Amino acid sequence: MTVKPLGNRLLIKPITEERKTEGGIVLPDSAKEKPQKAEVKEVGKLDEDYDLKVGDKVIFSKYAGTEIKIDDEDYIIIDVEDVLAKVED
């Protein structure tokens, strides 16, 4: 299934990192904070030049957007204004 966001929105895939305590215990998903880093998967028709494209990694507001599932994968549709920074390696 293909999802194309409308207007000033992005489809992003959260990047989750395995979390461990100092003692080496892996924390379950229910104990983790919501991720704030994601990869851009689709870009809507943006009104301005935000210099964002598919494949970019971004930091976004923690509770932004609408969470959806596509083919059993978690994605979020967010407003481009909720992107706080672009991560460059």
UniProtKB/Swiss-Prot annotation:
Superkingdom: Bacteria
Entry's Gene Ontology molecular function annotations: ATP binding; metal ion binding; protein folding chaperone; protein-folding chaperone binding; unfolded protein binding
Keywords (A to Z) from UniProt: Chaperone, Cytoplasm
PROSITE patterns: CHAPERONINS_CPN10 (PS00681)
A Gene Ontology term for the protein's cellular component: cytoplasm
InterPro entries xrefs: Chaperonin_GroES (IPR020818), Chaperonin_GroES_sf (IPR037124), Chaprnonin_Cpn10_CS (IPR018369), GroES-like_sf (IPR011032)
UniProt keyword Chaperone present: yes
GO biological process terms, semicolon-separated: chaperone cofactor-dependent protein refolding
Cleaved signal peptide residues: none
Protein's UniProt keywords contain DNA repair: no
Family matches, as Gene3D superfamilies: GroES chaperonin (2.30.33.40)
Principal subcellular localization: cytoplasm
Location relative to the cell: Cytoplasm
The protein's role, per its UniProt record: Together with the chaperonin GroEL, plays an essential role in assisting protein folding. The GroEL-GroES system forms a nano-cage that allows encapsulation of the non-native substrate proteins and provides a physical environment optimized to promote and accelerate protein folding. GroES binds to the apical surface of the GroEL ring, thereby capping the opening of the GroEL channel.
PANTHER family: 10 KDA HEAT SHOCK PROTEIN (PTHR10772), 20 KDA CHAPERONIN, CHLOROPLASTIC (PTHR10772:SF63)
Subunit organization: Heptamer of 7 subunits arranged in a ring. Interacts with the chaperonin GroEL.
Similarity comment: family membership: Belongs to the GroES chaperonin family.
Protein name, UniProt field: Co-chaperonin GroES
Source species of the chain: Petrotoga mobilis (strain DSM 10674 / SJ95)
Gene label: groES
